Amino acid sequence: MTLEQTPAPARTDVRRPASASGTTTTTRPYYKRGMLLTAGALAWAVGMSIVGSDPSGATEEAVFSTVSGLFQIGVLGLLTVLYQSQALGEGRLARFFLRLEAVVLMFAIGSTFVDGIGVSDLDKAGWMMLDLCWPLSMMGMFFIGIRIAIAGRWRGASRFWPVVAESWAVVSVPSYGLFGSTVAGFVGAAHLCVGYAVLGQIVARKQS
């Protein structure tokens, strides 16, 4: 008597795990926020190239406020990425500083909005204090960039490029005093393209 054993046919309706099939899924959790930062930086750069860094008249002010406001929203998105990824560190002080920067930036966005609709009055102390939130927020981002580099939690270009991007205030503001609003507008626009626009792409491609 002969016994013949026939193996069961392989099932074809079961999907193999990604590791077994040799394929992996790329996750980019910060993609949308990175692209928003790039779009905002480029929009503000274009607006600054057209109207300069010191707009005059209702139309120029409205255009400038719109594009700079888009940039500010992009930076606000960047702050959420930094908070989520603990880019400054895991301690309470790092979280507090990011929250404080977000509050100052939201006041700066409010300042941009009221400038755009033409209701601000810089001759009054309250409006002046609100207007100061804009440069203060940018200086805060500069210190955040330094802290990211020191903490070393982000790797590669993402560790050091924030310092480049967030040095916008320390580069562009002095150029306004030295060369006037026209030259400062082009300096600021170029810095936005090299700094924040590129940083947005780096953030968009981060996988963790």
Each model region followed by its residue ranges:
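Hydrophobic, aromatic-enriched alpha-helical segments typical of multi-pass transmembrane helices
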Residues: 2-208
